[in-house]
Amino acid sequence: MRYRGWCLCFLLAVSSALAPAAEKPLATRILIVKSTRTMTLFNGRKVLKTYKVALGTAPVGPKRIEGDHRTPEGIYTIDAKNPQSRFHLSLHISYPSVAEREQARRLGARPGGAIMIHGLAPDFAYLGPLHRKVDWTDGCIAVTNAEMEEIWKLVPVGTRVEIRP
């Protein structure tokens, strides 16, 4: 009887050690807060992870027109993933909305586009987290390449993105 108890304990220990690790749940929402330079991934109400980010070189205020170097503000969606991005990997954000296009048209300009969450270009990958010391993008949200690899796995196309001032 004692022998069976030890065998059972041994089998339970071995089976739990061999069981695949539980995968992290996927993000259902991304919250980017420009004033704190943070991006938080959520699954429901549960925080999966928060990252420090770099923004466009003119970070205050919402994006209005192409070339203003601002990061947009509003509710968007991840509508594409680009594994061949020149900034390591990238997730395309659905900016501009219909209203943002119309606003740019009224200003006699184009709204711009190609707003992404992305990593670092190969020539600057060595900077790692130092890249966050200054806002340097054309309006995108930048993280390190290691962070982007993690984000890439956690964020499916269709994920909601909220960008706040």
Label the predicted regions.
Residues 25-26, 67, 80-165:
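Exported/periplasmic cell-wall-interacting domains
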